[in-house]
Amino acid sequence: MGGLEEVFVKEAFDTNWIAPLGANVDGFEKELSEYVGSKTGAALASGTAAIHMALKAVGVKKGDKVFCSSLTFAASCNPIIYEGGIPVFIDSELESHNMSPVALEKAFKAYEEKGEMPKAVIVVNLYGQSADMDKIIKICKKYNVPIIEDAAESLGATYKGKHSGTFGEYGIYSFNGNKIITTSGGGMLVSNNEEGIAKVRFWSTQARDKARHYEHTELGYNYRMSNIVAGIGRGQLRVLEDRIAKKKEIFETYKEAFKEIEDIEMMPVCEYGEPNYWLTTITLSENSKVKPLDIILALEKENIESRPIWKPMHIQPYYKEYEFYSHNDEEEISISEDIFNRGVCLPSDTKMTKEEQERVIKIIKGLFK
């Protein structure tokens, strides 16, 4: 916690505004939207809810196709199923680990030949690094398909000076407990489409029509953020830049420590932007004698948590029957599978002390001796 969260939460209690509306909800929506440079936003129960509402806002219905990054967490694509849509997974590129414009173009051409188009493209900004949005936007504009930018992991990151999450028709952020700022649970949908956000607020409060009695002409959802949770978010937003600076320091410390180990490659930091360094990830060379599981188990033995990189959606048991477009059809495995096979997420908590990080580094270095 940054310190001011208690002030905003106390205000909610003192004024007896603890429902999913109030000064903190309004304030959090306004302050975060202004921070990222978007016209408006809707504070919601989760990032997943935000993706769901974005899909509904762009008109996804039963049977509609939605292109989505494969190398991501399941919350990026589960809402497609909620609306009866059909996900089509898109591979990554090595340069950013994010959606491959090459694979995206392949998917569009294939669907053009079929005589149909996806209803939307969900672009995920993995581990705080923005996708190459100029290339992706150019492709999506060519086929007149809206972008939903999943910036759950990349709040505060920029692409060519513009904030991650503000490039599509809608952008989403997550404030889950593990994100760069947290409300314990929550999300935000941002857009320059003020009418669309107003509709999302309506759907998210059970789609109650304006009437003296309870009247409903549309299906609604219990997706709005509470005034208490929003108060935590307002306090957290005030320390976001400090968090990003600390995350970058953690990344740079790992980078310096591992620079002599040829088999360790740090996560990409693309010249086109600045990530928020949410998680520091590494990939090991194909010929490395040390494998990702060796690192995970060695740290686990010392009660230190690390994790594999996200398992791509197109090889997940639930989603393996859905279509997938690869970056390079000539390779035996996709780029996203390759990153998964060779990748590790290292401890990156902003509360981690220098001594604790040095302990992590010492354990990993010891495996390569």
Model-derived features: positions:
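N-terminal "arm"/small-domain region of PLP-dependent enzymes with the aminotransferase-like
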Residues: 1-18, 347
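Phosphate-binding glycine-rich loop
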Residues: 18-65, 79-81, 89, 113, ...
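PLP-dependent aminotransferase class I/II
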Residues: 23-30, 35-39, 102-106, 110-116, ...
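Structural detector of well-ordered beta-strand residues that form the stable sheet scaffold
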Residues: 42, 67, 88, 146-148, ...
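Conserved G/P- and acidic residue-centered "switch" motifs that form tight phosphate/ATP-binding loops
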Residues: 47, 84, 150, 179, ...
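PLP-dependent aminotransferase-like
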Residues: 56-126, 130-142, 146-151, 158
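Conserved active-site segment immediately N-terminal to the catalytic lysine
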Residues: 149-183, 212-217
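Active-site PLP attachment segment
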Residues: 166-204, 227
